[in-house]
A protein has these predicted regions:
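Interfacial loop/beta elements and low-complexity acidic/Ser/Thr-rich segments
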Residues: 1-164
């Protein structure tokens, strides 16, 4: 998508799908992703996109979905003091030089209005870290809304892992 443009709204023609397959596979599915080719969208339009079924699903009641997209000017919104969550900590404790970071979200104004600080997840993966050693770790940021871009103002933190 062009730098000054962003998706304002995105509406599916169908919000439900019936899947057929083994019950054990069906029990593991809560949603179906449809890939939207954002880079090719430069104006308001409706696209028909195929639905790719997960492995183990034999068929579904629909094979494609129409997505209506409206485009607007890109805006940004900064969220202050988003907490950092440590993952793969196990039975250890972690201390770091900072506990929160600022995150700037880029997208359409309407999309940005729907995002709260609680929707943003910043993580530091502690897997494989040695204990009692200060280590620089890259932070990762994500959010539920995948039609916006999340950017960290701080990309690394220093962490020390110790036994509880």
């Amino acid at each position: 998508m062009e730098n000054d443009l962003a998706i304002e709204t995105c509406t599916l023609s169908q919000d439900k799908i019936t899947l057929y397959g083994k019950q054990s596979v069906l029990d593991q599915i809560s949603s179906i992703d449809v890939s939207l080719p954002v880079s090719s969208i430069t104006s308001d339009r409706t696209l028909k996109l195929p639905i790719t079924l997960p492995s183990g699903i034999t068929t579904s009641d629909i094979s494609e979905v129409s997505i209506s997209v409206t485009v607007g000017k890109q805006s940004k919104k900064t969220f202050k003091d988003v907490p950092i969550k440590f993952v793969n900590l196990g039975d250890r404790e972690a201390s770091s030089d900072i506990s929160t970071v600022d995150v700037t979200v880029y997208g359409g104004e309407e999309m940005l209005q729907k995002i709260d600080k609680e929707d943003i997840i910043v993580t530091a993966d502690l897997k494989g870290l040695s204990e009692n050693k200060k280590t620089s770790l890259a932070l990762k940021v994500s959010g539920e809304n995948r039609l916006v871009d999340y950017k960290l103002d701080t990309s690394e933190i220093s962490v020390t892992v110790t036994k509880k």
